[in-house]
């Protein structure tokens, strides 16, 4: 369920606040700032296919750890390299892809763990947590940007992603030890 929360949180915060973050980097051109969302969306559309294919071939737990690590790296690099147009495009494409990858990979893990009627209930919970993330993401990251400046856009989401990685890694490790 954590992956759906992360997807909702990162998706809503990044799509909603990206134009605000981008504005100083595009000479206060509102149209150019809004167009940055297109690079984010292109990653959201293209990379989930690759992530789904990888999920069929490799250990999903390790793939989730890799995906989260990429998200953390990208989010910490965004404030540093966003002024470079080629890096901006690459980082936004990757951010969009890993964000949607949380959803794809989370659903595949859910489908492996639950079957039948229980899967229906688990899927409803999955969507519920996604919605909670979508509601919390923009105000939390927006407040961080108010308090700590424009760079908090990437850094705050990076810290949240790091917390998710820690919780995911340690809870999965505990579950595997008990089995």
Label every model-predicted segment.
Residues 100-114:
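Intracellular juxtamembrane helix-capping segments at the cytosolic ends
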Residues 116-147:
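A late C-terminal transmembrane helix in Major Facilitator Superfamily
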Residues 143-161:
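A membrane-interface helix-boundary motif in multi-pass transporters
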Residues 35-44, 126, 130:
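Transmembrane alpha-helical segments of major facilitator superfamily
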Residues 62-77, 158:
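Structural signature of the two symmetry-related core transmembrane helices
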Residues 16-32:
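Short amphipathic helix-loop junctions that connect adjacent transmembrane helices
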Residues 47-59, 145-146:
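Helix-to-loop junctions at the C-terminal end of transmembrane segments
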Residues 1-13, 93-97:
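Pair of pore-lining "gating" transmembrane helices in MFS-fold secondary transporters
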């Amino acid at each position: 369920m954590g992956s759906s929360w992360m997807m909702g949180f990162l998706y809503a915060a990044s799509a909603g606040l990206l134009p605000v973050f981008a504005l100083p980097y595009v000479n206060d051109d509102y149209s150019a700032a809004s167009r940055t969302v297109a690079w984010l969306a292109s990653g959201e559309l293209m990379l989930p296919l690759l992530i789904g294919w990888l999920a069929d071939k490799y250990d999903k737990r390790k793939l989730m750890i890799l995906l989260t690590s990429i998200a953390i790296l990208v989010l910490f690099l965004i404030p540093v390299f966003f002024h470079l147009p080629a890096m901006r495009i690459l980082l936004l494409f990757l951010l969009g892809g890993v964000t949607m990858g949380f959803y794809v990979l989370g659903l595949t893990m859910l489908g492996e763990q639950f079957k039948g009627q229980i899967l229906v209930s688990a899927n409803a919970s999955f969507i519920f947590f996604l919605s909670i993330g979508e509601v919390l993401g923009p105000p939390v990251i927006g407040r961080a940007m108010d308090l700590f400046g424009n760079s908090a856009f990437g850094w705050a989401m990076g810290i949240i992603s790091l917390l998710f990685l820690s919780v995911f890694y340690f809870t999965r490790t505990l579950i595997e030890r008990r089995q």
